[in-house]
Amino acid sequence: VQSFLEFEKPIAELENKIADLRGLSTTENDVNIDDEIATLTAKVETTLTQVYSDLSAWQKTQVARHAGRPHFSDYVSRLITDFTPLAGDRGFSDDQAIMGGLGRFRGQSVVIIGHEKGKDTNSRLHHNFGMARPEGYRKAVRLMDLADRYGLPVISLVDTSGAYPGVGAEERGQAEAIARSTAKCLDLKVPMISAIVGEGGSGGAIAIAAANRVIMLEHSVYAVISPEGCASILWHTADKAPEAAKQLKLTAQDLLSLSVIDKIISEPIGGAHRDPGTTIDSLGNAINDYLTDLSDIPGDELRQAREDKFLAMGAL
């Protein structure tokens, strides 16, 4: 069942009319409803194009959080063959908010890491809604160590509202784990490509996104804090989240203009949740192009270029 966001009400009404028409018996009174369905379907496409061509930062945040967007497991199943997952941090436990392993991407051996939010109530609880604990970032470091050791490119997929802020996570060194994972990204001597595929929230995102190339899906977001968190700090109310989203410059379009990211991947009309397969294939093509470009660059140069890239951000 398609779920609709608040600003998609005109689209929802049209979709509901189409569903009602399809539910009618076409034999009753010899009424042919195909033409009416075709007209409404065309109107849905037109309305989708109009609505999605002018989304606000807050609306893009809502799209980025849509439960129907492709998840890490979807990308792996469509893009990676011979996937072998790696579990645990060899210190405390196996965090399920960050998944990863080794596999083949279009014939090339790679290490892939990413946040997994889960798709239903049980899986979301299992994956802690994509909010990683320290063990998740330490698992990511293990995977990056393997990539460095065996000369394998790293692909990371970011989709998290932020690292888990619980007491236990803090007691086990959340800040240190995030810092160490970020440092490992910057120290790699193999190509690293990161993609923001949904939410990119704060240190929980950058910990696996300090890459040679950072790309974003068209309606994903990437910021130092959530709009609700920012609004609560600045205005002492989460009701100001739409204004905070605008001021945070968190959209892919804003971040490309600021040179924080390298490329925007177009989503199907109506967002990635309307056509996950096409979205995944488009992202795969972009990743493949960047891996090809970076494959012949020596490791020391990759490392230095990555460091220079991030040191240059914010420079006047």
Residue ranges and their predicted role:
Residues 33-36, 136-137, 230:
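Short, motif-level signal for alpha-helix interfacial/capping segments enriched in acidic residues
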Residues 14, 56, 112, 159, ...:
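Terminal peptide-recognition signature
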Residues 70-72, 120-122, 164-166:
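Short active-site-adjacent helix-start/loop capping segments
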Residues 109, 116, 132, 164, ...:
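Gly/Ser/Thr-rich beta-alpha loop segments that engage phosphate groups in nucleotides
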Residues 1-109, 277-316:
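Intrinsically disordered, low-complexity segments enriched in small/flexible residues
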